[in-house]
A protein has these predicted regions:
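A donor-sugar binding/catalytic signature common to diverse glycosyltransferases
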Residues: 276-325
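A short, active-site helix/loop in glycosyltransferases that binds the activated sugar's phosphate group
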Residues: 157-193
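N-terminal subdomain of nucleotide-sugar transferases
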Residues: 1-51
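Conserved nucleotide-sugar donor-interacting segment of glycosyltransferase catalytic cores
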Residues: 82-160, 164
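Donor-nucleotide binding loops and adjacent catalytic segments primarily
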Residues: 192-193, 197-290
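Phosphate/nucleotide-donor binding subsite
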Residues: 49-104
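C-terminal amphipathic helix plus adjacent low-complexity
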Residues: 343-391
Length: 391
C-alpha cells in the first residue's frame, strides 16, 4: 500500500499527521510526505521521505499574517483559511502534489484539513482520499461556510478544471481521521458520521532537557505559543508577557519560541526561565505542572492527553474555540484581551494551587486513553482501498 500524505508546513499542521504516518510505516506501508520545502527539517527529523513542492512566492503571505495578529478572532480565522490556505498555499501546492502522484503513483491520498490541494488532486486523478482533522471538526465545518473561504475554494476548483462544489458535498463525504479528542468539540454542533478518532501513543525520550534543573523540585510551567505566532507582530510581546509573569514565581519555566527565532531576541530572563527554540512536546508534557499556551489544537491535545492544566491565551485561527472548550471542561483558564503579565501570573497560580483544574484535565486524559490506538487507523485505510477496488 502506497500512501501519499499532504500537509502544509508548520508543527501545527504536520504534527497531527505524524502519528498516522508512523502507524502506516509500522504496518509496512510505503509512505511519502508531500509538503512545502520549508517543512524539510521537521519531516526529515522524523525519518520520513519528503516530496518537497514549491513554497508560495516570497512575501505573498507576509502582509496577511502581519495583519492577522491585529484582527479579532472571528475575522482572523476566515482570513487565514480563505486568503492564505485556500488561495495562496493551495495554488502553490497543487502542481507539486500532482507531480508527486503522477511520479510516485500512490494508492490513496491523505491530507490534513487545511491542505486543500491534496484532495483536489486526488479527485482530478480518481484516487481515494482521506482527511486528517487538525482543528475542531464542527467549528471547522462552520468556518468553511464563510463567504471568504467558499469563494477561495470555488475559485481554486475552477482554476484546476474541477466541477463546482459550492456546498462542499465532496469534502464532507471524505473519511476523516483524527487524534483530537471529542471533548474539544462544541457539543452543540453535530459530528459527521465519517469521523474516526484515535489516540496517539507517543515515543517519549529523555535527554538534556532535565539536566537544566537537576535537583530543582519546583513545578515546571511550560510556555509555548506555537510555530506561527513567532512569525507575526505578536513576537516578542506575548512571550515577554509570559516570561515576566513567571519570573518571580517559585517555578521552573520552559519557553519555546520556534526555530525561526533566536532566544536572545527576548532579552535577559531570570534564572528560573529557560528559553529554547524547539523541544519535543511529548518530552515536556509528562513533567509539566501547568502550561501557558496559545490554544493550538495540537498543543492543547497533547496537554490534555497528559492531564496538564493550562492557561490559554488565544491569538488567532481556531485558538479561541479551544480556549473556550478548555475552560468549559474545567481543564484550565481562558485568558482574554491583550497579553498581561499580571493576568497570566494569576492564572498560573490558580492552576498550581486549585486541584480542580488538574482533575478536569485528567478526566479528558482518561477519555482519550479509551480511544483505539492510532495503529488501528491502518485497518481503516486498507478497508477503504478494498471498498474502492471492489466498486
Amino acid at each position: 500500500m502506497r500512501v501519499l500524505i499532504t500537509s502544509k508546513a508548520g508543527a501545527g499542521h504536520l504534527g497531527p499527521l505524524l502519528p498516522f504516518a508512523h502507524a502506516l510505516r509500522r504496518a509496512r506501508a510505503d509512505v511519502l510526505i508531500a509538503a512545502p520545502a520549508e517543512a524539510a527539517t521537521m519531516v526529515r527529523a522524523q525519518r520520513l521521505p519528503l516530496w518537497a513542492f514549491d513554497d508560495p512566492p516570497p512575501g505573498e503571505r507576509d502582509a496577511i499574517f502581519a495583519e492577522v495578529g491585529r484582527l479579532p478572532p472571528e475575522l482572523s480565522g476566515p482570513s487565514v483559511v480563505g486568503d492564505v490556505f485556500a488561495r495562496i498555499d493551495a495554488r502553490a501546492a497543487y502542481p507539486g502534489i500532482l507531480a508527486a502522484c503522477r511520479a510516485w503513483k500512490p494508492d490513496i491520498v491523505m491530507s490534513e484539513t487545511t491542505e486543500f490541494a491534496g484532495p483536489l488532486v486526488a479527485e482530478a486523478l480518481g484516487l481515494p482520499a482521506v482527511t486528517i482533522a487538525i482543528v475542531q471538526i464542527g467549528k471547522g465545518a462552520a468556518m468553511m461556510q464563510s463567504a471568504k473561504v467558499r469563494s477561495a475554494l470555488e475559485d481554486l476548483r475552477a482554476e484546476f478544471g474541477l466541477d463546482p462544489d459550492p456546498d462542499f458535498e465532496r469534502a464532507r463525504a471524505l473519511p476523516c481521521l483524527t487524534v483530537l479528542p471529542e471533548a474539544l468539540e462544541d457539543p452543540a454542533l453535530a459530528q459527521p458520521q465519517s469521523v474516526m478518532r484515535f489516540r496517539e501513543v507517543p515515543d517519549v525520550t529523555r535527554g538534556a532537557l532535565w539536566d537544566w534543573w537537576l535537583g530543582d523540585e519546583r513545578p515546571l510551567v511550560y510556555i509555548t505559543f506555537g510555530s506561527a505566532a513567532p512569525k507575526t507582530d505578536l513576537f516578542p510581546g506575548v512571550y515577554r508577557a509570559a516570561i515576566d509573569a513567571v519570573s518571580a514565581m517559585s517555578v521552573r519555566a520552559l519557553v519555546t519560541i520556534g526555530r525561526d527565532r533566536d532566544p536572545a531576541e527576548l532579552g535577559p530572563v531570570s534564572s528560573n526561565v529557560r528559553v529554547e527554540q524547539w523541544v519535543p512536546q511529548h518530552d515536556v508534557m509528562p513533567h509539566a505542572a501547568a502550561m501557558v499556551c496559545h490554544g493550538g489544537s495540537g498543543t492543547v491535545t497533547m496537554g490534555l492527553a497528559a492531564g496538564v492544566p493550562m492557561a490559554v491565551l488565544p491569538l488567532f485561527a481556531d485558538q479561541p474555540w479551544n480556549a473556550e472548550r478548555v475552560a468549559e471542561l474545567g481543564a484550565g483558564i481562558a485568558l482574554a484581551g491583550e497579553p498581561d503579565p499580571g493576568g497570566i501570573r494569576d492564572a498560573v497560580s490558580r492552576l498550581l494551587t486549585e486541584p480542580a483544574f488538574r482533575g478536569g484535565a485528567r478526566r479528558v486524559a482518561a477519555q482519550m486513553r479509551a480511544l483505539p490506538p492510532v495503529d488501528a487507523a491502518v485497518g481503516v485505510v486498507r478497508d477503504l482501498l478494498e471498498d474502492v477496488l471492489a466498486a
